[in-house]
């Protein structure tokens, strides 16, 4: 297939948009076979079925590399509590927060969880997402964690989107283990990880390293098992405080360290050395009305790749708009529109260990977005506006 009359944002490298005016893209199945100026299309592709894109902007398809779209229940009441002065930590310690979602998720059927998740996934797809990471972590027992991961796998069969799963058993201490996180890690989390891996449900292993969740020693035990199973790792780190999560992620060579509001310059250096991606999540920052901004300048200084995601979840980021996440990253964190677009494409792919996505180049996946926009900065600039004209998934319109 040949796409012509396009203004192509290749993102060939991280320095600029790599814009090709009057460009063309040839695909072969689900891969990009050639990209360049329309005048230079090789003869081998000129006889292909041609689609004139009308001079529209084409970018790599968007990737949401950090979501919790599978969950039961609703936590809108907590929104009111926080507006009345309760902190995220206070809500959690009072039995709300993640634990309230755990109760609802445990009680929901797979069918109900899938139906609810698909409403969120549909919103992401409508703004150009073709790859979504989905975490467990609202079960905190064997059966429900496995149930969540099975539902996550079913999303890819129910919708034209790819899904990568992350086992997040170390998300919170469930009520039945209150005050005894070590027993939970050893008796529930690690055995469940083994079971999920045996069932083929896990692509990566995640954890929440924070004062209200698990410390570095507890997370390390989970990561050691992940290593034995050959699974890559990710980590929620330095969202509400700094207890060494980012350094831990770097030591383990994690794919990503996520949130990272309280990361330091030394943490940024560690991420750069390990090649770990910093995933910033402005939806949670915004919803929780936080004031500590991720150290974007340090990430730039040390050439740490910055990814960006919705963090769609019921408590701290009920966000299903990647375009709004891009705007938030620019407005709240002072990222540039180029950084935001890279964060939702090439760097998001890196945060998932995907090497063939996020850029428009020969050999890459033919996942593309066609936009009614003049310049790529418009994607992060406008609010409440979806300029998506067409989403191309695996080379198919």
UniProtKB/Swiss-Prot annotation:
Subcellular location: Cytoplasm
Superkingdom of the organism of origin: Bacteria
GO molecular function: imidazolonepropionase activity; iron ion binding; zinc ion binding
Positions bound to Fe(3+): 66, 68, 236, 311
Free-text comment on the cofactor: Binds 1 zinc or iron ion per subunit.
Residues annotated to bind Zn(2+): 66, 68, 236, 311
Name of the protein in question: Imidazolonepropionase
Top-level EC class as recorded in UniProt: hydrolase
EC number in record: 3.5.2.7
Binding site for N-formimidoyl-L-glutamate: 138, 313, 315
Keyword set includes Cytoplasm: yes
Annotated metabolic or biological route of this protein: Amino-acid degradation; L-histidine degradation into L-glutamate; N-formimidoyl-L-glutamate from L-histidine: step 3/3
Reactions listed under catalytic activity: 4-imidazolone-5-propanoate + H2O = N-formimidoyl-L-glutamate
Chain residues that bind 4-imidazolone-5-propanoate: 75, 138, 171, 239, 316
Protein's job: Catalyzes the hydrolytic cleavage of the carbon-nitrogen bond in imidazolone-5-propanoate to yield N-formimidoyl-L-glutamate. It is the third step in the universal histidine degradation pathway.
The protein's required cofactors: Zn(2+); Fe(3+)
Family note: Belongs to the metallo-dependent hydrolases superfamily. HutI family.
UniProt keyword terms in alphabetical order: Cytoplasm, Histidine metabolism, Hydrolase, Iron, Metal-binding, Zinc
A Pfam family this chain is assigned to: Amidohydro_3
Organism: Roseobacter denitrificans (strain ATCC 33942 / OCh 114) (Erythrobacter sp. (strain OCh 114))
Paired cysteines (S-S): none
């Amino acid at each position: 297939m040949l796409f012509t009359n396009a203004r192509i944002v290749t993102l060939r490298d991280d320095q600029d948009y790599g814009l090709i005016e009057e460009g063309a893209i040839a695909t072969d199945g689900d891969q990009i076979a050639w990209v360049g100026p329309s005048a230079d299309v090789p003869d081998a592709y000129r006889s292909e079925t041609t689609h004139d894109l009308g001079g529209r902007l084409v970018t790599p398809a968007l990737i949401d590399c950090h979501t919790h779209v599978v969950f039961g229940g609703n936590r809108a009441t907590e929104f009111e509590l926080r507006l009345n002065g309760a902190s995220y930590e206070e809500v959690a310690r009072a039995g709300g927060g993640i634990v309230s979602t755990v109760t609802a998720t445990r009680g929901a059927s797979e069918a109900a969880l899938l139906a609810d998740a698909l409403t969120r996934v549909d919103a992401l797809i409508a703004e150009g997402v073709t790859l979504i990471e989905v975490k467990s972590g609202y079960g905190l027992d064997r059966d429900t964690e496995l149930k969540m991961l099975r539902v996550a796998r079913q999303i890819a069969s129910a919708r034209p989107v790819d899904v990568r799963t992350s086992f997040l058993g170390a998300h919170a201490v469930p009520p039945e283990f209150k005050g005894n996180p070590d027993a939970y890690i050893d008796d529930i989390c690690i055995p469940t990880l083994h079971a999920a891996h045996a069932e083929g449900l896990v692509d990566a292993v995640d954890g929440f390293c924070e004062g209200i969740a698990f410390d570095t020693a507890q997370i390390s035990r989970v990561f050691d098992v992940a290593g034995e199973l050959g699974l890559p790792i990710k980590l929620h780190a330095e969202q509400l405080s700094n207890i060494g999560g980012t350094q831990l992620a770097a030591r383990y060579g994690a794919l990503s360290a996520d949130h990272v509001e309280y990361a330091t310059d030394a943490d940024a250096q560690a991420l750069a050395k390990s090649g770990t991606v910093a995933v910033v999540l402005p939806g949670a920052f915004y919803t929780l009305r936080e004031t500590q901004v991720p150290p974007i300048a340090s990430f730039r200084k040390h050439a740490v790749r910055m990814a960006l995601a919705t963090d769609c979840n019921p408590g701290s980021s009920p966000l299903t708009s990647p375009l709004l996440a891009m705007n938030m990253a620019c407005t709240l964190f002072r990222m540039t529109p180029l950084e935001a677009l890279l964060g939702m494409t090439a760097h998001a792919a890196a945060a998932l260990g995907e090497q063939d996505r996020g850029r428009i180049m020969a050999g890459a996946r033919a996942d593309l977005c066609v936009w009614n926009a003049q310049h790529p900065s418009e994607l992060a600039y406008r609010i409440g506006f979806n300029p998506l004209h067409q989403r191309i998934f695996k080379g198919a319109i």
